[in-house]
Amino acid sequence: MPTINQLIRQGREKKRDKSTAPALKSCPQKRGVCTRVYTTTPKKPNSALRKVARVRLTNGIEVTSYIPGVGHNLQEHSVVLIRGGRVKDLPGVRYHIVRGTLDSVGVKGRMQGRSKYGAKRPK
C-alpha cells in the first residue's frame, strides 16, 4: 500500500484494455489470403463440422477465421476480408470472414439477415 506522498510523486498506472482482435491493429477490417480452408469440431457440449480458414493478412499476421453461412466457395489463395468477432465454441477463432466481398460470394437463397451474409435482394 503506497503512502500519500508516493501517490503524489508517481500516481497510479492506468490499466490498458486488451484488444479482442489484436491482428487487425485497430482497423475495422483487414484483407488477407487463405492459406488453408478446413473444417474443425467445436468444444464439449456442441457437435458439428465448423468451416474455418487460416488467413495470412496484409500485415503479415496469420489468423484463423470463421466462414459464416451455409456453403462457401473459398479455397487456398482466395482473397478475403476479415472482421473481428470470435466464435464461442471454437478455441482460437477470433475473426470472421466478411461474405459477399472480394473472392467470398454471398450466401445463396438467403432471405433474412441478408446484409450479414452478403446476399442480394431477391427479385
Curated annotation (Swiss-Prot):
The keyword Transferase does not apply. The keyword Heme does not apply. CDD domains: Ribosomal_S12. One of its GO terms (biological process) is translation. Signal peptide: none annotated. One of its GO terms (cellular component) is small ribosomal subunit. It holds the Pfam family Ribosom_S12_S23. The modification 3-methylthioaspartic acid is found at D89. Belongs to the universal ribosomal protein uS12 family. This is Small ribosomal subunit protein uS12. The lineage of its organism: Bacteria, Pseudomonadati, Thermodesulfobacteriota, Desulfuromonadia, Geobacterales. The gene is rpsL.
